[in-house]
Amino acid sequence: MVPSVAATAAIGVAIAQGALAASFSVSGQQFQVTAKSLDGTGFVQYGALDQTKKGNKPVAVVGLQSAKITNLCQAVTIPTPIGDVSMTLKAGGGEQVDAQKLYIDATDMKANARFDEVDIGVAVDATTKGPGPATPGENGRGAYVPGSFAQQAKTVHFTDVDQKAWATSAGTFTLPGLTMNVAMGGAECKN
């Protein structure tokens, strides 16, 4: 995986509404997250599998010790018996969103990226710059293969981020100016 794929996970903070439980079952429903910018410290990224009721999903798990995010938007469309229902959350239009000990399981991402003091190809178990891998299933993190490929960086900077993800967890989220909208039909965030 290339370093820019890792940015996918970093933006997932939009879905959080506070600290999540120590473990949870992944819904199997993807969501979109966009942001104008993300600055993070203590970055790690590795491949894993999320377990859902519909089977295993391959993901790029990204961990950040801390992240500051501007113009965050998260959108999900949920199929229901009465039609699609969308939920859109926005925060960080003025004061930045803050996330601590952030993990996100992502599948797709577009952004401009800069990595500082990056190591590519380190064993996942030997990462030291980010929060590191966790026991499979802990805080929504997928099962990884011990000794497998990972990358890490001291700091990261992403702009114009648009990503798809399955799950996010964090120790703490602060979402200034949080707004939520629920409506019939589909939802999409636009940078």
Give the positions of each predicted feature.
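N-terminal export and membrane-targeting signals
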Residues: 1-6
